[in-house]
Amino acid sequence: MASTPSLIGLTYAGLAVLYLLVLPLLSLLYVDKRWTSGSAWEKVLMFFLVLFFFPGMVLLAPFMTFRPKPRSL
């Protein structure tokens, strides 16, 4: 059985991955999907998510592309 310090370390590592990678990725995908069609309160929620998960957004931003989809002519 693992000792208490290693369990504490694993817990901190799991929370760090959750805060720095998983939740910012989910919120970036949500913002990308709903930015043009969201209501005013939904945009307030989006701004809060970006502010709250800013360190993770800075880590993920170089790998994300939010270019507009090509239009059909």
From Swiss-Prot:
Question: NAD as a keyword?
Answer: yes
Please give the Gene Ontology molecular function terms for this protein. oxidoreductase activity, acting on NAD(P)H, quinone or similar compound as acceptor; quinone binding
The catalytic activity, as recorded, is: a plastoquinone + NADH + (n+1) H(+)(in) = a plastoquinol + NAD(+) + n H(+)(out); a plastoquinone + NADPH + (n+1) H(+)(in) = a plastoquinol + NADP(+) + n H(+)(out)
What is the E.C. number? 7.1.1.-
Q: Please give one Pfam family short name.
A: NdhL
What's its job? NDH-1 shuttles electrons from an unknown electron donor, via FMN and iron-sulfur (Fe-S) centers, to quinones in the respiratory and/or the photosynthetic chain. The immediate electron acceptor for the enzyme in this species is believed to be plastoquinone. Couples the redox reaction to proton translocation, and thus conserves the redox energy in a proton gradient. Cyanobacterial NDH-1 also plays a role in inorganic carbon-concentration.
**Which protein is depicted?**
NAD(P)H-quinone oxidoreductase subunit L
